[in-house]
């Protein structure tokens, strides 16, 4: 049975993908957990294995497994993102920063720590839910099941994927399925 939004009729999907391999991080055996394995720096851009279809609402749940300072960006990016790109959060995609509660994104918005949430530094065990409504170009977030507001209204390129950017060596985050 296909779940549909009662407001707009869009299909609601639970993300079933995993992470794909890339530079500066390692994956768990099931490819659901990504761990930064290189020196500290914004150069580990882990992307999802499945694209987010246009015309749907896709829900993706992440769990912060391990973190030093919560220097983790969670969002979406074009599937073509350069996984080695340094500071990709300001050049390619739309992100929530779990350390400050700020938003970061590519031009033309070019957010740089735009204050989105008042608290900061999300601890280990925090569940971050990313809700992507491609039918109306909306990106929203929940923190531990508490809905915060819509973060972005944007026009999506055709192929977008979940993207997590890790800074600290040893930090890890997991795609969880409900």
Question: Where are the model-predicted features located?
Answer:
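PRY/SPRY (B30.2) beta-sandwich protein-interaction domains
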Residues: 1-178
């Amino acid at each position: 049975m296909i779940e549909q939004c009662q407001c707009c009729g869009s299909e609601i999907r639970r993300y079933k993908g995993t992470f794909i391999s890339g530079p500066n991080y390692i994956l768990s055996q099931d490819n659901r957990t990504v761990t930064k394995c290189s020196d500290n720096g914004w150069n580990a851009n882990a992307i999802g294995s499945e694209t987010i279809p246009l015309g749907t609402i896709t829900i993706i749940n992440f769990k912060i497994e391990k973190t030093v300072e919560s220097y983790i960006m969670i969002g979406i990016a074009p599937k073509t993102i350069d996984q080695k790109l340094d500071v990709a959060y300001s050049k390619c995609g739309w992100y929530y920063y779990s350390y400050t509660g700020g938003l970061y994104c590519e031009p033309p918005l070019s957010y740089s720590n735009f204050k989105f949430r008042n608290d900061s530094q999300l601890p280990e065990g925090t569940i971050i839910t990313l809700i992507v409504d491609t039918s109306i170009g909306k990106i929203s977030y929940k923190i531990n099941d508490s809905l915060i507001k819509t973060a972005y209204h944007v026009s999506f390129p055709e192929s977008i994927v979940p993207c997590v950017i890790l800074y600290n060596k040893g930090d890890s985050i997991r795609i969880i399925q409900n």
